[in-house]
Regions:
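Low-complexity, Gly/Ser/Thr/Pro-rich intrinsically disordered linker/tail segments
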Residues: 361-403
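Substrate-binding/active-site groove segments that recognize
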Residues: 241-267, 275-285, 369
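Extended ligand-binding regions for polar small-molecule ligands
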Residues: 31-32, 36-52, 87-99, 152-190, ...
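Export/targeting segments at the very N-terminus of extracytoplasmic proteins
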Residues: 49, 189-238, 273-276, 291-294, ...
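Catalytic and substrate-binding regions of cell-wall glycan-acting enzymes that process beta-1,4-linked
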Residues: 155, 301-375
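Acidic, polar ligand-binding/catalytic clefts
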Residues: 52, 59, 76, 94, ...
């Protein structure tokens, strides 16, 4: 009996040991499977889906008349600046599209994974973001960074003609040329302004020769006509023929696309009355997007900011302010986050939907108009038409214009 009991105990121990061995083998097998190499589009290397598409060829792109650029939002890649695309990678890709004789379409992605998956799906032709050369399914071509970790644009591996054309087109000197161009454009002002702008007749309360038009169309915007005049001076210094490098036109610097949206014929965009009338209509439209701001003067500051920097960017700044415990309906608090939208920590925040913006220009724009409006109110009479009635508060922040 004792011998049988000992034998049974040995069998039991061997069984447990065998179980441990089997478990270890299974775990090792699982770990081996988890280390299977994946393609950039999320399929196992060597699997049925591990195929490399060719994408649209150069001939296809030229026949379609459009090059599709896949990129990320940021100051060095792509961002919207008053309706005009900016950023080093965008400007370079724009030049390449011009070389091909086609239009450029920009598709902004959230991250590298989306860049790669959309390229594979045929939703883009070139990834215009410097990528590290570690994806064998891509052809690296065109733009090349100069740092120690060489990074380049990319197309699909088998799209040889497009890759070769990009390589022949790209020259390292192009980067310096485009950087200089962008720097010049962003630093160029169409007019020189002063906070305390000259009035046509200070003693008579006459701001400009367009006062009658400001008074006529201020009720459309539901603004004080002197605020409309202050904005006009900021935009063009009362020059009806003013035109910015970005294409903004006339007294109120209306972009051609905005003019089309407002029903303003391009043939009339430089005419004072149609230009002011369209601007007043646009201001009224922007105002409806800020009806959640109860205080009227505060609302007008947000409208001014949206006129300059874009409605969606201002809404992003409001979301950031609210997230960080600030009042999203006070411009002096939201303007801090307009400024912060130029830093990655903030323009990549999950509540931000429209990415990077050059916030300093918009903050200075609003400050300049607020100060000028306060000056105009001291000398020019208010019109009888409805408009803003409260006394404007001076801008909290010192602005960049000299007196």
């Amino acid at each position: 009996m004792k011998r049988n009991a000992a034998f049974i105990q040995i069998l039991f121990s061997l069984g447990r040991l065998l179980g441990v061995v089997i478990a270890c083998v299974m775990m090792a097998s699982c770990q081996q499977k988890s280390k299977v190499e994946m393609t950039p589009w999320g399929t196992p290397v060597g699997g049925e889906a591990d195929t490399i598409p060719t994408g649209f060829t150069l001939s296809d792109i030229q026949a379609n008349g459009e090059l599709i650029m896949l990129t990320l939002n940021g100051p060095d890649t792509y961002y919207d600046y008053r309706g005009r695309g900016m950023g080093l990678q965008f400007l370079l890709c724009e030049r390449f599209a011009q070389q091909l004789g086609v239009k450029l379409r920009v598709e902004v992605c959230q991250d590298t994974t989306e860049l790669l998956s959309r390229l594979k799906a045929g939703e883009g032709d070139v990834i215009a973001v410097p990528l590290p050369q570690r994806y064998q399914q891509l052809d690296y071509c065109g733009y090349s960074s100069t740092d120690s970790l060489k990074q380049m644009w990319a197309v699909l591996k088998n799209n040889t003609e497009l890759a070769d054309t990009l390589n022949r087109w790209f020259r390292p000197e192009l980067v310096a040329e485009v950087k200089a161009e962008e720097s010049f454009l962003l630093s160029t002002k169409s007019v020189t302004r002063r906070v305390y702008s000259p009035m046509l007749n200070r003693s008579g309360g006459i701001i400009s020769r367009f006062d009658a038009l400001f008074q006529k169309y201020a009720p459309v915007a539901r603004w004080d006509w002197r605020l409309l005049a202050a904005q006009c001076y900021q935009e063009s210094t009362f020059d009806p023929q003013a035109r910015s490098w970005a294409g903004a036109c006339g007294l109120m610097q209306i972009m051609p696309a905005t003019a089309t949206h407002l029903g303003l014929p391009h043939s009339q965009i430089f005419e004072p009355e149609p230009n002011i009338a369209a601007a007043a209509k646009y201001i009224a439209q922007l105002t409806t997007h800020f009806n959640d701001i109860p205080e009227r003067n505060e609302r007008c500051y947000f409208v001014l900011a949206a006129y300059n920097g874009g409605f969606f960017h201002i809404r992003d700044a409001m979301s950031l302010a609210q997230k960080n415990g600030r009042d999203p309906h006070r411009w002096d608090e939201v303007s801090d986050y307009v400024l912060k939208l130029s830093t990655p920590e903030y323009y990549r925040d999950p509540v931000v939907k429209h990415g990077y913006m050059r916030g300093s220009e918009t903050v200075n724009y609003v400050a300049g108009i607020r100060n000028r409006w306060a000056q105009y109110r001291g000398f020019a009479r208010a019109a009888s038409a409805p408009g803003l009635t409260g006394t404007p508060r001076p801008a909290k922040r010192k602005n960049k214009y000299s007196i």
